[in-house]
C-alpha cells in the first residue's frame, strides 16, 4: 500500500482495514453473497462507508461503496461528470483497497439527479447481473438508488439485505479500534471540563457548547453533536441542538451539556453532565444519586449473551418499582463510527450483547423541578463493564 497522505486525520491502520475486509468476505462466502452495496451521506450515522474505506461521508454528499467478495472496491462520490479512474493495487495513499473511483455532480436537493450515482453503480456492477447483491444499511440507501439497480441491467440479480452480516462484525471492536475509542472518551472529558470552566453569567448556551466543540477540534475531532440547555434551578430544561441554544445564562442557573462527538480517527463516544452556577438543589442531588443507581443497575445487565429486550423490560420494572418514569427512549446503545449503532437496548433488537462491544448508557428523566441524567460509555467484557470516561460522576457546582 502507498503511504497515507500527511493530510489524513489519524487514519486507521491498513492491517485493521484488511482484518475487516477478510472477516466480511468470509461471511459473504458463507451466505453466498457476491458483492455488497452501501451508501452514506454524513459522518454522524454514516459508519458503513467509513468502516470499509476509512473515509467519512460528509455534508450530505452521497458516498457509495461497492465491495466485491473477490476484488477491490469501487467508490462513487460527488465530483465531475465522467470521472472514472482505476487505481493501482497499492492504492493512491488515501483510498486503500479501492480499485476504481467514479463520480457525478449529484445532490439530494436536486431530485432530477437522483439516478446519476445509481447509473455509475450499475456500470461498476455489470459483472454481477446474475449474482447475489447484498444491500448494507438499507435505512440509509435511497429508494431511487435501489429501484434503479433493481429494474435495470441488474434485474436478474438477487438482492438481499446484508446489513446484519456487517453489523455482527462491526459491533465487536478490535484492540486497535478500542485504542481509538478510549482516546475519544478522554478527549470528551477535556471537552466537558473546558466547557464547564467557561460557564459564566451573560454567555449564551451556544457559546458554552462551542467551547466543548473547539476543545475537541484541538484533539482531532471532526464531527459531533453538542446539545445543551440552561435554566433556573428548580426547573427541568431539556437539552436541545444549536437552534435552541440562544438563552442567556444567569447566576444560579444550571446547564446540562451532552458532548457526543467523534475523536481523531472517527469513533464516537458520548459524555453528559450537569453543572450549576451556584448550588444544586437537594432534589437535583437526590435524583442524580438515583440516576447513578439506575445506571449501575443497567451495567449489571450488560453481559455477553444478554438481549436488548430483557434489559429493556428489567430496567423499566426497576424504574416502576422505584416510582420513576418508565424509559421509552433509547437509553443505552452501541457506538463506534456511528453516533448510534447496534446493538440497541430496545424490546425489538435481535442482536445479543458480546464482549468488546462499546455502549453508551444514559438514563434520563424529567420531573417538575429537575432534569435528571448522566451519560458515559462502557466496554462490555466477560468480567463486567469498564467505564471509558473519567469525568467525575457528580453535578458540578461552580460557585
Sequence positions of predicted segments:
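Active-site neighborhoods and metal-handling regions in enzymes and metal-associated proteins
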Residues: 1-399
Amino acid at each position: 500500500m502507498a503511504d497515507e497522505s500527511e493530510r489524513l486525520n489519524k487514519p486507521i491502520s491498513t492491517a485493521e482495514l484488511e482484518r475487516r475486509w477478510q472477516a466480511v468476505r468470509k461471511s459473504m462466502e458463507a451466505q453466498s453473497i457476491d458483492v455488497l452495496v452501501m451508501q452514506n451521506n454524513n459522518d454522524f450515522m454514516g459508519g458503513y462507508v467509513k468502516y470499509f474505506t476509512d473515509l467519512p461521508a460528509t455534508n450530505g454528499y452521497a458516498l457509495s461503496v461497492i465491495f466485491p467478495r473477490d476484488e477491490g472496491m469501487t467508490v462513487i462520490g460527488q465530483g465531475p461528470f465522467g470521472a472514472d479512474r482505476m487505481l493501482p493495487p497499492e492504492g493512491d495513499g488515501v483510498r486503500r483497497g479501492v480499485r476504481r473511483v467514479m463520480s457525478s455532480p449529484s445532490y439530494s436537493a436536486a431530485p432530477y439527479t437522483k439516478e446519476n450515482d445509481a447509473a455509475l453503480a450499475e456500470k461498476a456492477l455489470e459483472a454481477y447481473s446474475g449474482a447475489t447483491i447484498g444491500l448494507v444499511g438499507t435505512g440509509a440507501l435511497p429508494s431511487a438508488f435501489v429501484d434503479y439497480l433493481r429494474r435495470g441491467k441488474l434485474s436478474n440479480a438477487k438482492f438481499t439485505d446484508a446489513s446484519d452480516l456487517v453489523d455482527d462484525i462491526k459491533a465487536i471492536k478490535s484492540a486497535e479500534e478500542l485504542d481509538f475509542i478510549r482516546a475519544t472518551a478522554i478527549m470528551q472529558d477535556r471537552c466537558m471540563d473546558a466547557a464547564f470552566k467557561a460557564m459564566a453569567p451573560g454567555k449564551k448556551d451556544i457559546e458554552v457548547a462551542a467551547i466543548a466543540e473547539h476543545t475537541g477540534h484541538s484533539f482531532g475531532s471532526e464531527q459531533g453533536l453538542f446539545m445543551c440547555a440552561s435554566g433556573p434551578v428548580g426547573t427541568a430544561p431539556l437539552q436541545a441542538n444549536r437552534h435552541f441554544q440562544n438563552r442567556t445564562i444567569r447566576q444560579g442557573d444550571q446547564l446540562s451539556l451532552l458532548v457526543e462527538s467523534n475523536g481523531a480517527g472517527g469513533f464516537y463516544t458520548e459524555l453528559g453532565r450537569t453543572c450549576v452556577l451556584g448550588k444544586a438543589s437537594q432534589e437535583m442531588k437526590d435524583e442524580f444519586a438515583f440516576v447513578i443507581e439506575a445506571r449501575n443497575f443497567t451495567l449489571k445487565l450488560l453481559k455477553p449473551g444478554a438481549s436488548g429486550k430483557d434489559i429493556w423490560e428489567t430496567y423499566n420494572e426497576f424504574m416502576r418499582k422505584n416510582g420513576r418514569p418508565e424509559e421509552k427512549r433509547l437509553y443505552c446503545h452501541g457506538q463506534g463510527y456511528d453516533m448510534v449503532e447496534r446493538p440497541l437496548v430496545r424490546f425489538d433488537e435481535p442482536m445479543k450483547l458480546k464482549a468488546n462491544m462499546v455502549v453508551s448508557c444514559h438514563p434520563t428523566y424529567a420531573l417538575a423541578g429537575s432534569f435528571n441524567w448522566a451519560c458515559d460509555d462502557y466496554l462490555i467484557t466477560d468480567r463486567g463493564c469498564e467505564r471509558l470516561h473519567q469525568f467525575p460522576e457528580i453535578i458540578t457546582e461552580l460557585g
